[in-house]
């Protein structure tokens, strides 16, 4: 039987997509990425700088529940 690992799949969401009006976006919606994180090493929420296709620029993506 397999052990339960320390790695969990998390979703990262763009922080700027919610505040920018739809007229300034390339397409409607919110940018989201999925990734894995090690629960033992990073107990706090992830915050990475990723490319947002809706805004066509690099933005901060934060972990959501």
UniProtKB/Swiss-Prot annotation:
Question: Residues annotated as region Disordered?
Answer: 20-40
GO CC terms: cytoplasm; ribonucleoprotein complex; ribosome
TM helices/strands, residue ranges: none
Keywords of this entry: Ribonucleoprotein, Ribosomal protein
Under HAMAP family, the record lists: Ribosomal_bL33
Q: Which Pfam families match?
A: Ribosomal_L33
Q: Which InterPro entries match?
A: Ribosomal_bL33, Ribosomal_bL33_CS, Ribosomal_bL33_sf, Ribosomal_zn-bd
- Indicate whether Ubl conjugation appears among the record's keywords: no
Q: Which GO terms are recorded in the biological process aspect for this UniProt protein?
A: translation
What Gene Ontology molecular-function terms does this entry list? structural constituent of ribosome
Q: Which family does it belong to?
A: Belongs to the bacterial ribosomal protein bL33 family.
Q: Which domain of life is it from?
A: Bacteria
Organism equals Prochlorococcus marinus (strain MIT 9211)
Its recorded name reads Large ribosomal subunit protein bL33
């Amino acid at each position: 039987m397999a052990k339960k690992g320390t790695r969990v799949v998390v979703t990262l969401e763009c922080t700027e997509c919610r505040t920018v009006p739809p007229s300034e976006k390339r397409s409607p919606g919110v940018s989201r990425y999925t990734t894995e994180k090690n629960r033992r090493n990073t107990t706090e929420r992830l915050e990475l700088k990723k490319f947002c296709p809706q805004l066509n620029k690099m933005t901060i993506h934060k972990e959501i529940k």
